[in-house]
Amino acid sequence: MYNTKKMIPQLHSWYEKQKRPLPWRKTTDPYKIWLSEVMLQQTQVKTVIPYYNRWLNELPTLKAVADTTLEKTLKLWEGLGYYARCRNFYKACQIVEKEFSGHIPESKKLFLKLPGVGEYTAAAVLSIAFGKQYPVLDGNVYRVMARLLAFNGNRREGNRVFLNTLEEWIVEKTDPGDFNQALMDYGSLICT
């Protein structure tokens, strides 16, 4: 197993120099971060960027989404695929506007109740937008963890082991959002 006392500062240093200049990294607005996470599901970053920018030009706030029509959101999504993501995001924005006065819940339990929000999306949004100490585990992070822990077992066991380890590590990090994004970038750019 890798020495985490060395690894975490090294990862942070690498990320500060190598992080990708993505538009959703220039904001702490939970709506914009959430939108990016939904769009990035099963879709490459380079494909998402123009859709993300176009969407925000038309619907810059969660309230704007809640107040528009489903048809308009689907038109903006057209070509991105996996349209259930858009329908769920639209429904979820309406719920947030109505039940939470337009404020995305900072409680993981409440956020997970929204349509289309799963463990990964909740952890990503809450750690990046609100600094909550929730680890993310996507394919990129899985590859990093498998190498660091020299793990070659089955995926289900790997998920359990990696999440437990990440939960320990993220407590050591002052910015859990940066920690999660650093692991994702490292997995995407280095551990391919």
Language-model features: locations:
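Catalytic cores of DNA base-excision repair glycosylases
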Residues: 2-192
